[in-house]
Amino acid sequence: MAIKLIVGLANPGTEYAATRHNAGAWYVDLLAERLRAPLREEPKFFGYTSRITLEGEDVRLLVPTTFMNLSGKAVGAMVSFYRIQPDEILVAHDELDLPPGVAKFKLGGGHGGHNGLKDIISKLGNNPNFHRLRVGIGHPGDKNKVVGFVLGKPPVSEQKLIDEAIDEAARCTELWFKEGLAKATSRLHTFKAQ
């Protein structure tokens, strides 16, 4: 099944743009830049969107302009308009359980406490069977510090690692369309930024 929608999760506004919680949007921004497909605000989809072509496949890019916990509103609008199935969606999000410099593809699973994923699963009729790109941001070491951590900006050294992992994830996304998910996954899962 080909991917028809790639979503980068984020909170809107300049005050959140550089926070860890916006790592998913950084990936979609990079894809849009690499493929020369600038994102434009599209109110009916509650987000910034663009259209790219990968190996002859039409793919929509989406960065919701809703707050993170309402991400499903944007995804739901696009899915119903373009008749996209859950397994044709790739959602990029920040991942506490992976260190900076690591990114991994995954199909299905729970939301792991991520409010963006939680809302998307709910708006897809409680169907969690969409693809995810988990962008490692690390963990503060104390669950009580998670909110401040994800809404904080990574130090320069961590930002560099996250950026390198996102860069590799973008290359592996293109590889996915060329040579399949297994090959793309194998390459991405052996990558660790230094």
Curated annotation (Swiss-Prot):
TRNA binds at residues 16, 67, 69, 115. It catalyses: an N-acyl-L-alpha-aminoacyl-tRNA + H2O = an N-acyl-L-amino acid + a tRNA + H(+). GO terms for molecular function: peptidyl-tRNA hydrolase activity; tRNA binding. GO terms for cellular component: cytoplasm. The record marks 94 as: Stabilizes the basic form of H active site to accept a proton. It holds the Pfam family Pept_tRNA_hydro. It comes from the Bacteria. The keyword Cytoplasm applies. Hydrolyzes ribosome-free peptidyl-tRNAs (with 1 or more amino acids incorporated), which drop off the ribosome during protein synthesis, or as a result of ribosome stalling. Belongs to the PTH family. Monomer. NCBIfam families: pth. This is Peptidyl-tRNA hydrolase.
